[in-house]
C-alpha cells in the first residue's frame, strides 16, 4: 500500500491465525501498529437449566464438573478456527479441562441458540452475542475472560476473580503499512487517540456492549507480539 499516510487499515484477531493455518504468511510484523481500539472478551456461558440440574452456579463449579466428566461437555463457538472456537482451546489449555468444541459454520448466533435450547451445554462467545438469551434467563454467564467486568453485565465476575488467570478476547486496532514516515506516524497516532475519546464513538460502543480498550502504538505492538504466542497455544489445544 501507499506509504503517504492516507492508507491505513484495521487489524483483527484473525491475523494471528493465518500463518499457523497456512492461509497466509502475513503476521502483525508486516504492519506498523497505530493503536488498539476495542476488545471483546470471550465469556463462559451455559444453559440455565443444565447448570441448575447439575448444581453449577459459578466458574469453579463448572471447571470441577468438566474435570469429573472429561470429554462430555459440549461447548459451541463459531466457525472452525474462528476466534470463539479457539477460545475453547484457550479455556482448556488454561484450566486443564477436556471439553468438546462444536463448530458452527453459520456463526456464533447458531451456537448461542443451540445452547439456549439445550442441544449443547454452553458457548465460549462474547457477552454481546449471548446478551438476549442471558437477559431472558435461558443462559447464565459464569465468567468473562477479561481484566475487568463488562459494564453491561456488572454482576458477571471475571475469571480472575474466581481464581483462574484467563484473559482472552478478539481485538480490533488500526495499523499503517510499513515504511510510513515517522512524523506522519506520530500524527496518525495522535488522531487515533483523539478519535477514541470522541463522545459519539464512545456512546456507539457503549450502546452495543463493545469495550473500548485503547493502547498506543507501542502498547499495541507489545500486545500483538504476546497474542501471537497465546493464540498459537490455544489453536494447538483444539487441534489446529
Language-model regions, residue ranges each:
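Solvent-exposed coil/turn segments that connect beta secondary-structure elements
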Residues: 13-15, 39, 49, 128, ...
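Hinge/capping helix and adjacent helix->loop/strand transition within the periplasmic-binding protein
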Residues: 1-7, 20-110, 171-204
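Ligand-binding "clamshell"
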Residues: 3-4, 20-32, 97-100, 133-144, ...
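Ligand-binding pocket segment of bilobal, Venus flytrap-like solute-binding proteins
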Residues: 72, 76-156
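Short, Asp-centered acidic motifs that coordinate Mg2+ and/or phosphate
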Residues: 6-10, 43, 121-122, 141
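Mature extracytoplasmic/periplasmic domains
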Residues: 186, 197, 201-222
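C-terminal lobe and pocket-closing loops
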Residues: 129-197, 226-229
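Extracellular/periplasmic bilobal clamshell ligand-binding domains
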Residues: 216-240
Amino acid at each position: 500500500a501507499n506509504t503517504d499516510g492516507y492508507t491505513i487499515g484495521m487489524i483483527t484477531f484473525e491475523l494471528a491465525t493465518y500463518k499457523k493455518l497456512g492461509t497466509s504468511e502475513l503476521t502483525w510484523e508486516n504492519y506498523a501498529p497505530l493503536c488498539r481500539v476495542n476488545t471483546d472478551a470471550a465469556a463462559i456461558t451455559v444453559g440455565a437449566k443444565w447448570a441448575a440440574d447439575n448444581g453449577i452456579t459459578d466458574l469453579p463449579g463448572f471447571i470441577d464438573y468438566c474435570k469429573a466428566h472429561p470429554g462430555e461437555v459440549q461447548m459451541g463457538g463459531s466457525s472452525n478456527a474462528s476466534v470463539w472456537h479457539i477460545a475453547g482451546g484457550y479455556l482448556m489449555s488454561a484450566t486443564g479441562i477436556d471439553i468438546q468444541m462444536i463448530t458452527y459454520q453459520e456463526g456464533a448466533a447458531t451456537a448461542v441458540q443451540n445452547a439456549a435450547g439445550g442441544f449443547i451445554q454452553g458457548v465460549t462467545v462474547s457477552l454481546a452475542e449471548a446478551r438476549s438469551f442471558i437477559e431472558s434467563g435461558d443462559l447464565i454467564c459464569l465468567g468473562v475472560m477479561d481484566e475487568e467486568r463488562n459494564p453491561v453485565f456488572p454482576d458477571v465476575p471475571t475469571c480472575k476473580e474466581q481464581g483462574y488467570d484467563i484473559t482472552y478476547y478478539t481485538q480490533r486496532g488500526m495499523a499503517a503499512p510499513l515504511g510510513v514516515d515517522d512524523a506522519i506516524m506520530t500524527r496518525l497516532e495522535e488522531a487515533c487517540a483523539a478519535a477514541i475519546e470522541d463522545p459519539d464513538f464512545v456512546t456507539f460502543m457503549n450502546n452495543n456492549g463493545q469495550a473500548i480498550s485503547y493502547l498506543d502504538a507501542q502498547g499495541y505492538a507489545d500486545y500483538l507480539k504476546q497474542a501471537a504466542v497465546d493464540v498459537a497455544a490455544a489453536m494447538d489445544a483444539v487441534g489446529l
